[in-house]
């Protein structure tokens, strides 16, 4: 029995998402995924085995994933009946219903339609007894256009906990730059609510490499963390002269703190391999316990550049004989880059993405 997977991604990164998913499925489960369709902001892959070879956390370039149960061409008038007919054939109860679309300008125009359509669908399914509080499966309707819907299902371990796989955050009014949203999203995605409470505590220390104007430093300060802000550029706003900030106009690749710190964060514009090696050196040497950093990827061969950078990290940590956690995601607030979380020690040993 073949299964088709829907992977949602940032527009322009579809082939990277496809390449990565096929590689991960083959290396981890011995499953060959066959390309079915590459659209704008999504990819369809087919497997001959009824297994889900990965979850959304295992893939850097895919925001979320689900299993397609129907691909329906819709008419102009009645879009509800064909969907109800398909769902009615499945002996499934759903915890919730999400309407989704590609993260494109045309896709975003679907949001108005979704606001009107979703209550109608929920009412029909609730009346039919297909919605239940004890269910875990989520029904996801992905509209590449108004005339087509991919009906799919997802479990919590497969798909991201946000529609479209997008965690939307509000820009803080007093943050020095919009880059602050990158670190805020990274903490939420990699640590979760409980992890942030446990690992981001007042009184901790951190180093921010490439800190100016202070977007990432601001996220640390709001949690009461002392920051060495390393950058030749000026800090701005509340980060300029803050009592918890020590601004050092030094080379980020040469700086080391006088004592080990709890956190290392870095958003420097540099080759991904060089940044990866620097981050791994810090943790292997014991200069930092955890790190969040961005890898700026080249326009061509992005998946290859990412794989090379991660292999450099793994080689360094292996040479040091250290257990570690390694996770990678292209976050919503990232652009031509991915964000990496690297930590030691890892209670369960190595965890690649």
Curated annotation (Swiss-Prot):
GO terms for biological process: methylation; rRNA processing. Its main location: cytoplasm. Its EC number is 2.1.1.186. This is Ribosomal RNA large subunit methyltransferase M. It is found in: Cytoplasm. S-adenosyl-L-methionine binds at residues 179, 212-215, 231, 251, 267. It comes from Laribacter hongkongensis (strain HLHK9). The active site is at 296 (proton acceptor). The gene is rlmM. Catalyzes the 2'-O-methylation at nucleotide C2498 in 23S rRNA. Coiled coil: none annotated.
């Amino acid at each position: 029995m073949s299964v088709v997977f829907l992977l949602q991604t940032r527009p322009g990164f579809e082939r990277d998402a496809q390449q990565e998913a096929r590689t991960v499925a083959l290396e981890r489960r011995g499953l060959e995924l066959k390309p079915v369709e590459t659209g704008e902001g999504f990819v369809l892959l087919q497997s001959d085995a009824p297994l889900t070879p990965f979850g959304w956390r295992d893939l850097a370039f895919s925001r979320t994933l689900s299993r397609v149960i129907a691909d329906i061409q819709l008419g102009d008038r009645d879009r509800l009946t064909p969907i109800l007919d398909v769902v009615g054939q499945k002996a499934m109860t759903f915890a919730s219903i999400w309407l989704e679309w590609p993260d494109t300008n045309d896709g975003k125009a679907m949001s108005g339609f979704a606001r009107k359509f979703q209550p109608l669908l929920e009412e029909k399914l609730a009346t039919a007894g297909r919605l239940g509080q004890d269910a875990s499966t989520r029904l996801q309707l992905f509209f590449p256009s108004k005339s087509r819907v991919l009906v799919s299902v997802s479990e919590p371990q497969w798909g991201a906990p946000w529609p479209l796989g997008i965690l939307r955050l509000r820009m803080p009014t007093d943050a020095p730059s919009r880059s602050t949203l990158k670190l805020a999203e990274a903490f939420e995605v990699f640590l979760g609510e409980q992890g942030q409470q446990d690992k981001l505590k007042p009184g901790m220390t951190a180093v921010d490499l490439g800190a100016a104007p202070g977007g990432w430093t601001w996220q640390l300060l709001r949690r009461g963390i002392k920051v060495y802000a390393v950058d030749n550029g000026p800090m701005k706003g509340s980060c300029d002269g803050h009592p918890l900030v020590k601004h050092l106009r030094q080379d980020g690749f040469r700086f080391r703190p006088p004592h080990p710190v709890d956190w290392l964060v870095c958003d420097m514009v540099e080759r991904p391999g060089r940044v990866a090696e620097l981050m791994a050196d810090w943790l292997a040497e014991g200069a930092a316990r955890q790190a969040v950093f961005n890898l700026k990827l080249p326009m061509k061969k992005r998946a290859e550049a990412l794989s090379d950078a991660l292999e450099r990290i793994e080689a360094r940590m292996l040479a040091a004989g250290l257990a570690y956690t390694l996770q990678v995601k292209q976050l919503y607030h990232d652009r031509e880059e991915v964000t990496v979380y690297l930590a030691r020690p890892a209670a369960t040993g190595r965890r690649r993405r």
